[in-house]
Amino acid sequence: MIDPIAFLHLSPTTLADVLSRNQVMDCGIRPLWPGMARIAGPAYPVRCAPGDNLMLHAAIYRAPAGSVIVVQAGDLEYAVAGGNVCAVAQRRGIAGFVVDGLIRDVAEARANSFPVYARGVVPFPGGKEVAIPLNTPVVCGGVSVAPGDIVVADEEGIAVIPHAQAEAVLARALAKAEKDGAETLDAWESAHRARIEEILRRKGYVG
């Protein structure tokens, strides 16, 4: 069984090179401030109803330490979490939030260095009316996320590695990172130019 922390030293950029496009979230979900630390951990999926944040507030007491709580929020009008929720999640060992929606009190999360990736910030809180089963598959940033899938997020993007593919993806990504790290810029430029010129030749481009 792969320890999700093994992915912590791999950029989502490297992972994207060995994953399909439907395993990388869309660019609208971003770190909410510059310099946010990369996170990697098993997904604990949460779905919230429109205008409601009950299930994320419940999840912070149920998700195992080290988890990345991945939230399918129901709207882009209300916040699903604020400063205290982020602080409690951090204190309980949650690695971070990835939210297809909005949060509030971003300054508090930033001051505590608790990683939050979301679509933005709004001051209005959601309600607490709708109970939905926790730790079941969700869609976040256009990607299906199941419990235990590995989530890796940083300023480059957010990659989701299906749990069953984790070992194979890790091996491919480590090999890619090693190859890239050993290649000089001169070697890369030479190979890149040859490849581009060959593509242009096939396209009939002259110039």
What are these regions (language model features)?
Residues M1-P147, I161-G207:
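Feature captures the catalytic cores and cofactor-binding loops of soluble hydro-lyases/lyases
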Residues V151:
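C-terminal binding/interaction regions
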Residues D154:
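Acidic/polar active-site rim loop that often engages polyanionic ligands
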